[in-house]
Swiss-Prot record:
The gene is RBM23. It comes from Homo sapiens (Human). Aryl sulfonamide anticancer drugs, such as indisulam (E7070) or E7820, promote ubiquitination and subsequent degradation by the DCX(DCAF15) complex. Aryl sulfonamide anticancer drugs change the substrate specificity of DCAF15 by acting as a molecular glue that promotes binding between DCAF15 and weak affinity interactor RBM23. Keywords: mRNA processing, mRNA splicing, Nucleus, Phosphoprotein, Repeat, RNA-binding, Transcription, Transcription regulation, Ubl conjugation. This is Probable RNA-binding protein 23. Belongs to the splicing factor SR family. The lineage of its organism: Eukaryota, Metazoa, Chordata, Craniata, Vertebrata.
Length: 439
């Protein structure tokens, strides 16, 4: 056997198992495609068809089946895709569905919706309150819902003094306190008109003090009775307002500093022959004088020994007060003091040394001088003289307050003011004293 033939035999032997498997697979496929009756009919008709034609038909059928399967697979995919789209279209929002509406529908119904919106806006503006002071926005962001701020009680035409009388001063307050807390706390004793918490100018933190003003003055003592009660865990202190005293102190301070404006001085212990022109010549070098009034007796026209001088500038009046108080004029030391007008219409006179005005031209002034000299020398005056000096001081106070003029008090009146004692009193004589007639 030749080598070529041997190779062919070996190759056929190696391919034989594979050919058997292919033949068996082809038979199985033919059996599946053709049922038993078909196979029997074909066997009866004879062996007219060849094996090659049978294999070709089988391959065609395979290709048709694969095409059908791929087509079915595509159809199923398209069905799944359509089902997914339909499901998503159902879950879409109504707003997105409205986008697919036709333009004709929008043109037809757009004007109606716009007119409806305009009517709704007009209705809302009509119902909503107008923007004005006293309203503030609440927690809602809508401008149609506003929270009214607490309405402050209307203020009558009250003077500052009357408002101060209805105000209390609160101390020792908690740092986190608010005006609403104080209003709720004091509303138990009366209607609160205003609350002011004093805060630091730089840090804006509360200083722990506040002013509370009531509508009725009867609520002030009740509010003061709340002292010691705890507000936000801290015992509160309530006092009457010191605003009037603070105002007067500020006015006096302004006068001392010389902040513009007129100032009135009292000039006393004058000789009876001193005239207004003499006083003007003495006081005018210190500044411009607006008015000089020398008090005189209405019957005799004689000077009473005191008067009032008004300077146009308080600084000039202050210098005159410092320089001329105690200045000796016609043998008498002048008494110069500052005049303060009181709310009741009276006047208060204060001197730099704190002494009261002594008028040596009257009996009361001489009594007071005697008491002052005796006190400085350590001599005890008799009880009658001490009582007379006290009565003279009382009369001088009445005269300074404007209640009773000192000239209207005669010695009999001074005697009536002193207590009547039936005991003998000690007396002493003073000699070498000047008299008004010898001046």
């Amino acid at each position: 056997m030749a080598s070529d033939d041997f190779d062919i035999v070996i190759e056929a032997m190696l391919e034989a198992p594979y050919k058997k498997e292919e033949d068996e697979q082809q038979r199985k496929e033919v059996k599946k495609d053709y049922p038993s009756n078909t196979t029997s009919s074909t066997s009866n008709s004879g062996n007219e068809t060849s094996g090659s034609s049978t294999i070709g038909e089988t391959s065609k059928k395979k290709r048709s089946r694969s095409h059908n399967k791929s087509r079915d697979r595509k159809r199923s995919r398209s069905r799944d895709r359509d089902r997914y789209r339909r499901r998503n279209s159902r879950s879409r929002s109504p707003g997105r569905q409205c986008r697919h509406r036709s333009r004709s529908w929008d043109r037809r119904h757009g004007s109606e919706s716009r007119s409806r919106d305009h009517r709704r806006e007009d209705r809302v503006h009509y119902r909503s309150p107008p923007l004005a002071t006293g309203y503030r926005y609440g927690h809602s962001k809508s401008p149609h819902f506003r929270e009214k701020s607490p309405v402050r009680e209307p203020v009558d035409n009250l003077s500052p003094e009357e408002r101060d009388a209805r105000t209390v001063f609160c101390m020792q307050l908690a740092a986190r306190i608010r005006p609403r807390d104080l209003e709720d706390f004091f509303s138990a004793v009366g209607k609160v008109r205003d609350v002011r918490i004093i805060s630091d100018r730089n840090s804006r933190r509360s200083k722990g003090i506040a002013y509370v003003e009531f509508c009725e003055i009867q609520s002030v003592p009740l509010a003061i009775g709340l002292t010691g009660q705890r507000l936000l865990g801290v015992p509160i202190i309530v006092q009457a307002s010191q605003a009037e005293k603070n105002r007067l102190a500020a006015m006096a301070n302004n006068l001392q500093k010389g902040n513009g404006g007129p100032m009135r001085l009292y000039v006393g212990s004058l000789h009876f022959n001193i005239t207004e022109d003499m006083l003007r010549g003495i006081f005018e070098p210190f500044g411009k004088i607006d008015n000089i009034v020398l008090m005189k007796d209405s019957d005799t026209g004689r000077s009473k020994g005191y008067g009032f001088i008004t300077f146009s500038d308080s600084e000039c009046a202050r210098r005159a007060l410092e320089q001329l108080n105690g200045f000796e004029l016609a043998g008498r030391p002048m008494r110069v003091g500052h005049v303060t007008e009181r709310l009741d219409g009276g006047t208060d006179i204060t001197f730099p040394d704190g002494d009261q005005e002594l008028d040596l031209g009257s009996a009361g002034g001489r009594f007071q001088l005697m008491a002052k000299l005796a006190e400085g020398a350590g001599i005890q005056l008799p009880s009658t003289a001490a009582a007379a000096a006290a009565a003279a001081a009382q009369a001088a106070a009445l005269q300074l307050n404007g209640a009773v003029p000192l000239g209207a008090l005669n010695p009999a009146a001074l005697t009536a003011l002193s207590p009547a004692l039936n005991l003998a009193s000690q007396c002493f004589q003073l000699s070498s004293l000047f008299t008004p007639q010898t001046m």
